[in-house]
């Protein structure tokens, strides 16, 4: 049986915002990376931020510090090649 992986996806409003959040998060030592927005969620700007669920509150605080907002937060569950998303 395939192991399950859980992570968060934050949908950013624009590419510049995605890059600013990624840069700020990495400076804080967070494990984040820009990914293409999964088509099953929403198109948005085309880029999202993948993050560890344990860092969700820290990410929200960083967004507030930077004066940026998101189109939504999702929790992902990946089993093998299958990924499901739940909006939070």
What are these regions (language model features)?
Residues 13-19, 84-88:
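Short N-terminal helix-initiation segments at or just after the protein's N-terminus
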Residues 13-15, 22-64:
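Amphipathic, hydrophobic secondary-structure cores in small proteins
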Residues 4-11:
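Short glycine-/aliphatic-rich beta-strand segments at the starts of folded cytosolic domains
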Residues 56-88:
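C-terminal structural segments of small proteins and small subunits
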Residues 1-4, 41:
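Solvent-exposed alpha-helices and their adjacent loops that cap or buttress functional pockets
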Residues 11-14, 77-79:
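Short, flexible beta-strand-to-coil junctions
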Residues 6, 43-45, 69-70:
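A generic structural signal for well-ordered coil/turn residues at beta-strand boundaries
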Residues 1, 24-32, 84-88:
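A short, terminal or domain-edge coil/loop segment
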């Amino acid at each position: 049986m395939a192991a399950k992986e859980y992570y968060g996806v934050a949908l950013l409003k624009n590419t510049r915002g995605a890059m600013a959040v990624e840069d700020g998060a990495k400076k804080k030592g967070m494990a984040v990376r820009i990914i293409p927005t999964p088509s099953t969620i929403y198109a948005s700007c085309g880029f999202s931020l993948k993050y560890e669920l344990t860092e969700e509150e820290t990410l929200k605080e960083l967004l507030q510090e930077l004066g940026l907002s998101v189109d939504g937060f999702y929790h992902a569950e990946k089993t093998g090649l299958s990924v499901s998303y739940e909006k939070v």
